[in-house]
C-alpha cells in the first residue's frame, strides 16, 4: 500500500529482463504481467474484473475442444423442449476457465498448487455476462523458496448473482527466502 492506504497498481511495473531480445526491448515493462512476491501479497486485497458476455459460438467451440457434448450444453432441441431450464447452459468448465481468466494476473513468481471448494452455484446460459472478484484470503510459509497463498474467486452474472465459487492455492516465490528459513514446513 502507498502512504494514502490505497493499493498500488502492479501491472507492468518492472520487466523480467529476458536475455533473448534486444536490451532496449527487455527494459520495457511487460503488459498484463506482474512480478510480485510472497511478501507483497496483502491478505484481504480484492480485485474485480471487467465483464464478459459468453456467446453461442465460443460456448460450442469450448464444448468441442473439451469434448463436452452433454445435451444441456450442446443440444438446443433437448435443452429447450426437455431440459429443466428450457435453454442451453454454458459448460461449468468454461465458466470456471473464463471466470478465473478474467482476473488472471500472470505473475511470473506464482505457480498454481491446486483448487479447493469448487462449486457451481447457479447456471450460466449462452448470452449471460459474467465478472469475477478475487480476494487474497491467507498466506503461510510453505517451502524453502516459496510460500502458499489462498485466494477466492467469486464469479457473478448479471447484476451480482453468484454462479461459481472456488479457492485457488498457489505457491509464490519469496523475495528474501532467508527471512523464512525457520518458518516453513520441514519435510
What would you call each of these model-derived segments?
Residues 2-113, 175-187:
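Hot-dog-fold acyl-thioester-processing enzymes
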Residues 114-158:
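Hydrophobic beta-sheet segments that form the core/acyl-binding groove
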Residues 36, 42-49, 129-131, 148-150, ...:
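Intrinsic-disorder/low-complexity, polar/charged segments enriched in Ser/Thr/Lys/Arg/Asp/Glu/Gln
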Residues 117-122, 168-173, 180-184:
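A structural preference for long, well-packed, hydrophobic secondary-structure segments
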Residues 3-7, 151-174:
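Short peripheral tails and domain-boundary helices/loops at the edges of structured domains
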Residues 55, 138-139, 170-172:
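A short acidic/small-residue loop/turn micro-motif
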